């Protein structure tokens, strides 16, 4: 086969993908963290951690499309999660190429590309995001039809069990390639019951990010219009899991918008919880900390006994909040932001504890069956995620917390263990890497891809071609749920550069773009927390010229259409190229 291994002993592939996993949490690979994760730690100690690993489009579905195809979003056609065309399953992907090379291929868990999976001998995937409890799976049925079935249990455990079953029942005469797609730690975060109390204790030892109350000065104006604020955009119910029925009127009136409060009064929410003061002045009232989102919350798919466990836990959370509020401990916006951040961390990190157990279970299975020496294990998140840095949750931006993603690779005897690589790598690189180690890296296959194989990094974690490689990024989903602008750009070892295509409302009215809103340049060496846009700083004029030249070179190399990602109400029409 190719350059890595003889054709008589082709390696297996176990590709584990989580959803919205911040690489900052890979710090839990270290033994002295407040929240130890032995599965992640073992994987890091036995494999290589890539500290400068980036996505190409920080959204769940598009990132997965980039991994499958080895191509950027505009060249695989899947630009955003919803509202556009489904992933075109007829295009070249590495699972199809592995199939053709004699591999048995499968996927369990999250797919999130709308279309029916292709390139797999078997699949059991969520119809969309999946639910934390009793999720629905779909698989191929008679006459090529998709059939659905609901499984009972916690989603991470179910996906892990399906992965083990798939490996148990595979054709043992063939090498295998299995994708394990976990829902966790995607919103809305519901840890397994066994982790609720432990994670609360862990989070009590954590300190909020020092940028939690960022005012977004000195950066493009769109950051101030972003709708992913921990303080203002997290829902009290669906995200923070407060129990509405336990919050009395004197507290509730400060944490929801006035329109939502009126609706609660009309529905009699406070009837058995102190009622509403007869002299309450609706006209004069202005809530202190009104969450903009007030949709329902996700305990709907649980069995009654399971729901009771969560209700007991979240009842306690709500009771403690009401007591703190009435005791005057929630006076400022920072006070409220820290509380919402702490609830967020309890739930987000709690979901990762089950993923950690899944990793241990899967690695133990490989050990027991003599597969560890000849199986490449890849662990990735589909992108990064804000954990309160700059006051945000979610992703979408070219800023570091969103753009950078976890990547760990383990292949015993082939990949140096315990190394933290500083190479500049991207998720479009996984497909060509997998093809090379499988001996399927024919010119016909590799020529469809824009990524490069990472095998030169396997020995030491470093190679000249990866030292300061510029990594292209593009985000298309505008208008969208969180109001992030369309933008594209790239990251080098030192600089983050972007062209923000979407004008602000004022710029759209005037027809004039302000340079500080249109262009972004961050000097990550001098400004590692990315607090200052120096695009218009005269001291960086020459750097800006260099960055714009690299930007246009990258757009040319990757055949980005001239008007893409565009600045109008719709994405420009263009034909993906592969």
What are the language-model segments listed below?
Residues 1-519, 528-549, 553-556, 562-578:
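Formylglycine-dependent sulfatase
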Residues 525:
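Residues forming the ATP-binding cleft of Hanks-type serine/threonine protein kinase domains
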